[in-house]
UniProtKB/Swiss-Prot annotation:
CDD domains: SiR
Domain of life: Bacteria
Sample GO molecular function, one term: flavin adenine dinucleotide binding
Quaternary structure note: Alpha(8)-beta(8). The alpha component is a flavoprotein, the beta component is a hemoprotein.
Free-text remark on how the cofactor is bound: Binds 1 FAD per subunit.
Residues that bind FAD: 323, 357, 387-390, 405-407, 411, 420-423, 600
UniProt-recorded name of the protein: Sulfite reductase [NADPH] flavoprotein alpha-component
Name of the gene: cysJ
Organism (species): Photorhabdus laumondii subsp. laumondii (strain DSM 15139 / CIP 105565 / TT01)
Length: 600
């Protein structure tokens, strides 16, 4: 049903909150809406934002807890810690890093940061503004602050947990005192996180005495996502059906990009443009057989994974990573195999990291043969983790479907074809109507403007175009009046113009106001989206002055950095600013949610 909102000035909610709410209840019946109104009224009256016991003694110190999350893990851990602290009758306010007013940091007495790392050791996207502020000349001394940091990362990357390390070091440099040493968590972090939570809660309970009658407060920042969340999660995914897997690059393309449609049926799974889809996958049985043969194992041996007993073959297919090597795995395997070449790498961290990056697990075993026990080998490997893909559809148009735009990872090692774990699973091994286990990873840091009249600039080369297809479907469904400008790039026009017909229709219909295309291999000199941005610098600056929101999606290591440099150059040149002023201006756009990135 369609609901016409009253004047924003009369509402106790922001325009952004109203739009998010409307997107969630758009298909609710009048009966359901009436029930919801009573539900929310009851929630407000039964669960007030400040839970009070009879106030008596002076208010205790409040703990400020900041989650800097990239894929939701830091946020979930922060919520677990908040519950621990509340159970001990401690005051705690939980903030997403993007919502934290960082200039109030000088007033913080107890500061806890849980920080994910993305790309090449960079902070999570929502934490960039806070990170830059802490390293700026404006940041005050924090001599009256105590703090603790938990870092989340992945040992397959060279700068493991670098963002957590940076936050920890910088707070200490500013005069803050550690409550306990920083802890770094790998992909399978829950056990060390549980220990850290228990230790930190004990320290804080001793530091902050509580008495009967103390008023206990907690920021209740329930989002629309939480209110309307379904029962499907990473741990309990939805089993949906693969409806379509269609190659959308040409025969002559060096890239294999798939348009994937998944049927949600009557599951009730909900998502918004900007969200990601988590996909659980299985390893290629042929790869599993190759590994078993190289190790002289049968696959029928019994092993234990997370307390569950199963065959080695089943464990290798469904429970552990086989396509992502890490320096930790190389080091452990070197000791197990007693291989001199691998053992020599251990002393050279950079060489070890490079070897792990370039040599898949199967090829490492081929180079350094060994005959371990089945359980020994399983214990070397990391648990299988789902892959996240930017959603390329809007439920306003696709209803009970979710679409993905997936680049299939294909390469060769010494003449042997290798394929990405999840992308190969989707493209090569699943058939139409096959079951696929999925869940939604909400991303409130990549959302369309609340005001449909706001201009939008979308920058997404390659499969980075995915969320912008969802954006345009949503803007069309909403009848949004705001202008839309797309910057897209790929190697060749004839082979790699993803969703060409759809973009041409949007241009023809007037929904897509402008489109700039960068084909890097169609001429002698390479042209990328950042070059097109600079070429249109004056117009881009005009749109920014008109209030445009900027969105970037795609490769974090090169493209996103090059695009940011181009934006800084545009702001400096056309805004009449020096380098420092341009950087502050872009940081302000980020803080205002006018510059958002979904990079990986």
């Amino acid at each position: 049903m369609s609901i016409k909102p009253p004047s924003i000035s009369l509402l106790p909610v922001s325009p952004e909150q109203l739009v998010r709410l409307q997107s969630e209840i758009g298909d609710f019946s009048p009966t359901q809406l009436a029930w919801l109104s009573g539900y929310f009224w009851g929630m407000v009256n039964q669960q007030p934002q400040v839970q009070a016991v009879v106030p008596a003694v002076p208010a205790q110190e409040t703990i400020t807890l900041i989650s800097a999350s990239q894929t939701g893990n830091a946020r979930r851990l922060a919520e677990q810690l908040r519950e621990d602290l509340l159970a001990q009758k401690l005051n705690v306010n939980l903030f997403n890093a993007g919502d934290y007013k960082f200039k109030q940091i000088a007033q913080e007495k107890i500061l806890i940061i849980i920080a994910s790392t993305q790309g090449e050791g960079e902070p999570a996207e929502e934490a960039v503004a806070l990170y830059k502020y802490l390293y700026s000349k404006k940041v005050p001394k924090l001599n009256d602050t105590v703090f603790a940091v938990f870092g989340l990362g992945d040992t397959s990357y060279e700068r493991f947990c670098q963002a957590g390390k940076d936050f920890d070091n910088r707070l200490n440099e500013l005069g803050a005192q550690r409550l306990l040493e920083r802890v770094d968590g790998d992909v399978e972090y829950q056990q060390v996180a549980d220990q850290w939570r228990k230790q930190l809660t004990g320290i804080l309970k001793q530091r902050i005495p509580t008495e009967t009658g103390t008023e206990i407060t907690s920021a209740q920042d329930r989002s629309v996502n939480e209110v309307f969340s379904t029962s499907y999660t990473k741990q309990a995914p939805l089993t949906a059906a693969l409806a379509t897997c269609q190659k959308i690059t040409g025969r002559g393309s060096d890239k294999d990009v798939r348009h994937i449609e998944i049927d949600l049926g009557d599951s009730g799974l909900r998502y918004q443009p900007g969200d990601a889809l988590g996909v659980w996958f299985e390893n290629d049985p042929e790869l599993v057989d190759e590994v078993l043969n190289l190790l002289w194992l049968q696959g029928t041996e019994q092993v234990e994974v997370n307390g569950q007993k199963l065959s080695l073959r089943e464990a290798l297919i469904s429970h552990v990573e086989l396509t992502q090597n890490t320096s930790v795995i190389v080091e452990k395997y070197a000791v197990l195999a007693k291989d001199e070449k691998l053992l020599s790498l251990i002393a050279d961290k950079q060489a070890l990291q490079q070897y792990a990056h370039n040599k898949p697990i199967a090829d490492m075993i081929r180079e350094a043969a060994s005959q371990p026990e089945a359980q020994q080998f399983i214990d070397l490997l990391r648990p299988l983790t789902p892959r996240l893909y930017s959603i390329s559809s809007s439920q306003a148009e696709m209803e009970n479907e979710v679409h993905l735009t997936v680049g299939v990872v294909r390469y060769e090692i010494d003449g042997r074809a290798r394929t990405g774990g999840a992308s190969g699973y989707l493209a090569d091994r699943l058939q139409e109507n096959s079951d696929i286990r999925i869940f939604i990873e909400h991303n409130d840091n990549f959302r369309l403007p609340a005001d449909p009249r706001t201009p939008v600039i979308m920058i997404g080369p390659g499969t980075g175009i995915a969320p912008f297809r969802a954006f345009m479907q949503q803007r069309e469904a909403d009848g949004a009046e705001g202008k839309n400008w797309l910057f897209f790039g790929n190697p060749h026009f004839t082979e790699d113009f993803l969703y060409q017909v759809e973009w041409q229709r949007y241009v023809k219909d007037g929904l897509l106001t402008r489109i700039d295309l960068a084909w890097s291999r169609d001429q002698q000199h390479k042209i990328y989206v950042q070059d097109k941005l600079r070429e249109q610098g004056e117009a881009v600056w005009c749109w920014i002055k008109e209030g445009a929101h900027l969105y970037v999606c795609g490769d974090a290591n090169r493209m996103a950095k090059d695009v940011e440099h181009a934006l800084l150059d545009i702001i400096a040149e056309h805004g009449g600013m020096d380098t420092e002023q341009a950087d502050e201006f872009l940081s302000e756009l980020r803080f205002e949610r006018r510059y958002q990135r979904d990079v990986y």
